[in-house]
Amino acid sequence: MAREENTGKSKEELEARAWELAEDIRICMFITWDGERQRSRPLAAHIDRKAHAIDFLTDVDGHKDEQVAKFPTVSLAFSDGKKNRYVAITGKAEISNDRARIKKLWNPWAKAWWDSANDPKIRVIRVTPEDAELWDSPGRVASTVAMLAAALTGKSPKLLDNAKLEAI
């Protein structure tokens, strides 16, 4: 179910846009619950639309693995302030030691944290999205034009598409 907020877009278009934004922005704040408070940290997302999942490489020594094991509902906050594009995703996370998936996700950036994909401390956190909310700007030029038009007409500008997506 989608609340389109007068975007003129279908649920399918909005879902596709949420996936596209997450894939484009790539780095998100991965937010867990430790039983007392939320904990956030930046992680690189690996989007797998076919599997309807978002994967993250993580280290077994981190606290987030324990938090995910106890409280699997997590939030992912993707933010591109320069282009005014944002997507927040909530879903269920699970930790895996799937060595084949780790090798598939391995890239040169991971080398900053581990020597190789064979490092026994690497784990995968897979998040299956349950719902999302996106805010999407048409871009700086269009936003500037909308603000100028608003200044001339006295009407509030519509600068961002906003939509809540349930059961994505």
Residues of each region from the PLM?
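C-terminal edge-of-domain segments
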Residues: A2-G8, P120-I168
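Short beta-strand-initiation
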Residues: I25, S40-P42, D119-I122, L160
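Charged, amphipathic alpha-helical segments
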Residues: E12-E15, D61-G62, P108-A110
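Short, structured beta-strand-loop surface elements
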Residues: E5, K64-D131
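Extreme N-terminal tail/first-helix region
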Residues: M1-M29, L152, D161
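A short, compositionally biased
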Residues: A22-R26, F71-P72, T128-P129, K158-L160
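Short beta-strand segments
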Residues: R26-D61, E66-V68, V74-D80, Y86-T90
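A short, sequence-level motif marking secondary-structure junctions
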Residues: H46-I47, K92-I95, G139-V141
